[in-house]
C-alpha cells in the first residue's frame, strides 16, 4: 500500500516536470496619472509611440515649453508624457476646470435664475412701490425673457409705477473684471444682471415697460446693489436657463462671459451672498484634492482662462478629464458640449482628416503666446483616450495648433 502511494506521487511529479508550462498571464499594474513611470506592461501600438517621439523633435519645441499627457482611459494607464507636471498658462482650457467643477458641484439639471419682484400696493392700476430685478448672472437672458418680465407687470393690471426700478446685484461682489485680466482685452462685464451679454439690463427693462404703455414715474437711475433680503416682496416672474445650455456655448464657442457666469454659480452655491471668485476657488480646490492632486501646486484666477495668473498642468487637465469619464453624471454633460474636430465650435476648421474628423472632442485655448488643446479621442485600437497639450511661449499660435493637430492625428491613425 505504501509503495503504491509512493509510485502515484512520483508519477504526478514527473508529469508536472514534463508538461510544457503555460505562458503566464500579464499582471495588470494599477497605474495612476500621478505615477512617475508609464505602466511597463501596457500593450500599445509601437507605431503610435514612434510618431509621438518624432513629434518631440519638432523645431517648435526647441524654443518653447510643452506640457503633454496622453492617457488611455480604457486601460486606465498613461501612455505618453512630456513635461506633464510643468505649470503653464492654460488659456481657454481653463474652461474645462470650470465646467467639470460646476457639473460635479451643481448637477446637470442646475438652472440660472433671474427674478422680478415688487413691493408696496397696487391701487387702481397704480403700483405704489418698487420693482426689483434680482440678478442671477444668466448669460442667456434675452429679449424674450425681458418681454416676459414686462408682461408680468402688465398682467397685474399695472399701468403706472409710482416708485423705482431697482437692480438687486447682491448675488456676487462688485468686481466687474477678473483677476489678472489685461486692460486692453475685450473683456466681458461681470454683472449679475445681463441682457444680450451686455450691462444694460435696467435701461432695457424700462424701455420694455414703456413699449407696453407702463409709465415709471421715478426717472432716476436704478440703484445697483440693493439687497432684497428682509424686504416684504411679492414675486412676479422668474426666467430660467439650464446649465447644459450654458455649457454648450461656453465650451463649443469658448465664450468667456458664459464661463465666468458658471464660475459665479459655483461661488454662490449654498446660498452665499456677494459671492466672489475666491468662493469658487474653494470648490475647485476641493475637487482637485479629490482626484489626488495638490491644489497648492496650481493657481486658479478666473473661470474663462483670460487671466494671465492661471497656472495648471497637463497632468491636472487630464486628471479632471479622467474623473469626468468615470463619472457618468459629469461625462454625460461635458462630452456633448465639447467642440468636435471638423464639425463645430472652435474645432470646426481643424483636423478634417479621415481619422480625426468627428473623432476628436476637445477644448481649445488661445492667448498671446499660449496655445492649448485638451479633451478626448478614440484611438485606432478602439481605446478611449484623454489628452492635454499646452504650448507656451509660441510666437505664432498657428504653429501650436499645427503641432496639436499632428499629435491628435498620431493618436487616431492606424
Predicted regions and their residues:
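Second-shell loop/turn segments in exported
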Residues: 34-43, 81-90, 131-140, 150, ...
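A conserved catalytic-loop motif detector
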Residues: 132, 148, 171-214, 238, ...
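A small/polar active-site loop signature that marks catalytic segments
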Residues: 199-335
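C-terminal soluble interaction/assembly domains
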Residues: 299-414
Amino acid at each position: 500500500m505504501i509503495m503504491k502511494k509512493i509510485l502515484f506521487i512520483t508519477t504526478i511529479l514527473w508529469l508536472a516536470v514534463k508538461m510544457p508550462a503555460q505562458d503566464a498571464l500579464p499582471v495588470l499594474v494599477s497605474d495612476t496619472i500621478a505615477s512617475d513611470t508609464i505602466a511597463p506592461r501596457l500593450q500599445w501600438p509601437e507605431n503610435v509611440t514612434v510618431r509621438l517621439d518624432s513629434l518631440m523633435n519638432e523645431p517648435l519645441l526647441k524654443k518653447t515649453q510643452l506640457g503633454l499627457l496622453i492617457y488611455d482611459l480604457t486601460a486606465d494607464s498613461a501612455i505618453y508624457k512630456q513635461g506633464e507636471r510643468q505649470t503653464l498658462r492654460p488659456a481657454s482650457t481653463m474652461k474645462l476646470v470650470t465646467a467639470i467643477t460646476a457639473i460635479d458641484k451643481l448637477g446637470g439639471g442646475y438652472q440660472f435664475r433671474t427674478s422680478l419682484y415688487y413691493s408696496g400696493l397696487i391701487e387702481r392700476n397704480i403700483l405704489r412701490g418698487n420693482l426689483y430685478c434680482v440678478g442671477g448672472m444668466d448669460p442667456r437672458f434675452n429679449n424674450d425673457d425681458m418681454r416676459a418680465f414686462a408682461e408680468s407687470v402688465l398682467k397685474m393690471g399695472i399701468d403706472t409705477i409710482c416708485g423705482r426700478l431697482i437692480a438687486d446685484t447682491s448675488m456676487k461682489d462688485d468686481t466687474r473684471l477678473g483677476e489678472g485680466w489685461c486692460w486692453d482685452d475685450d473683456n466681458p462685464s461681470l454683472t449679475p444682471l445681463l441682457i444680450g451679454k451686455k450691462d444694460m439690463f435696467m435701461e432695457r427693462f424700462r424701455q420694455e415697460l414703456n413699449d407696453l404703455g407702463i409709465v415709471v414715474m421715478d426717472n432716476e437711475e436704478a440703484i445697483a446693489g440693493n439687497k432684497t433680503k428682509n424686504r416684504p416682496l411679492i414675486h412676479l416672474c422668474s426666467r430660467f436657463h439650464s446649465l447644459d445650455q450654458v455649457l454648450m456655448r461656453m465650451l463649443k464657442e469658448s465664450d468667456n462671459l458664459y464661463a465666468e457666469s458658471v464660475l459665479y454659480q459655483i461661488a454662490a452655491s449654498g446660498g452665499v451672498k456677494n459671492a466672489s471668485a475666491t468662493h469658487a476657488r474653494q470648490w475647485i480646490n476641493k475637487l482637485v484634492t479629490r482626484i489626488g492632486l495638490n491644489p497648492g501646486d496650481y493657481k486658479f484666477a478666473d473661470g474663462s482662462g483670460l487671466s494671465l495668473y492661471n497656472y495648471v498642468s497637463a497632468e491636472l487637465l487630464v486628471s479632471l478629464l479622467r474623473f469626468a469619464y468615470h463619472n457618468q453624471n459629469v461625462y454625460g454633460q461635458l462630452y456633448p458640449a465639447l467642440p468636435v474636430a471638423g464639425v463645430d465650435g472652435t474645432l470646426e476648421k481643424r483636423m478634417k482628416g479621415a481619422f480625426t474628423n468627428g473623432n476628436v472632442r476637445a477644448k481649445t485655448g488661445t492667448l498671446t503666446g499660449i496655445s492649448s488643446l485638451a479633451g478626448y479621442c478614440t484611438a485606432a485600437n478602439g481605446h478611449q483616450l484623454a489628452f492635454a497639450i499646452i504650448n507656451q511661449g509660441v510666437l505664432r499660435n498657428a504653429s501650436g495648433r499645427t503641432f496639436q493637430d499632428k499629435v491628435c492625428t498620431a493618436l487616431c491613425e492606424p
